[in-house]
Amino acid sequence: MTAAGETGIVFRNVSKFYGEVLGVNRVNLTIPPGITSLVGPNGSGKTTLMNLLAGLVRPSRGEVTVLGIPPEEPERLFQVVGYCTQFDSYPPGASGREFLLATLALHGCEPAAAARKAQAALERVKLAEAGDRKIAAYSKGMRQRIRLAQALCHDPQVMILDEPLNGLDPLARAETVALFKQLGSAGAYLVISSHVLHEVDAISDQVIMLSNGYVVAEGQIHGVRAEMREHPLQVRVRCSHPHALAAAVIGHPQMLDARVLEPDAWGSPGLQVTTRDADALYAEINRLMAANRVPGLDIVSIAPADDDAGSVYQYLVGEAGGGA
């Protein structure tokens, strides 16, 4: 049963089977406001999870609620959910504005309110000047943006976004990411599926990692990585005199390995240190510099090398899990 006054997105022991084929199994999640990214290869359960959330399929077992609303109440659910699919399908002959007005009519908006909301949505995705053109004449990136406008035009509290950055040029991509962050900061729930893992790293407040229908990890990427104590941390140090620094740090009990790196695209050489404790490495480098143990040492940057979504996923499921 759904708890009275329940908020958030909740999956309780949810399984979905398509005949004998597993979609997802025994999923227990509470998704908070902000940007949550689903990570996993094709067939891992991402699409099933989004379809369950949108009420497009029903669980075989368990219960899903969205802001306290079960999918068995689609009229209520669709008022709070917007879904941006990756499918390039529109009403024949419709302009961008007509597409949005039709969507808003389905949500029960009066014509005057629908006109205002459609215009606002076009402006948010930078399509105001193209709103009255036929969608069939839009570029791939413009069609992606009108799908996004369709998902947000009725001001939903929950947005389900399937590959929402696909086909966008760099400027439109940056503008769309900024819009997502604005919506997340304002308290909306954004659930995003993306195969571009560096974008997942850049925009996500938390991730849900799936493999073969199971949730294998959830939370902030850095927090998930920090819990994986069986895998020593990899830290990349761009610096002058990397050979001398490697020789100086390798004697520390928390340092397991130090490998000199070739210069990067900006010409900075460096080293990659394998350590049980990144904070101990940072403290050791500070101590070495203060004591001038490596004369002429200049640190350009220090950054973790394996606490991104791709690395964490591979640690969790191994190479057999495939790409996300």
Question: How would you describe each model-predicted region?
Answer:
Residues A3, T274-A324:
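C-terminal coupling/interaction segments
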Residues A54:
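Helix-to-loop junction immediately C-terminal to a conserved catalytic motif
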Residues G62-L77:
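Conserved ABC transporter NBD signature motif
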Residues L101, A105, A112-A130:
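Conserved ABC ATPase "signature" region
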Residues M159-E163:
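Catalytic Walker B motif of ABC-type/P-loop ATPase nucleotide-binding domains
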Residues V177-T274:
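ABC transporter nucleotide-binding domain
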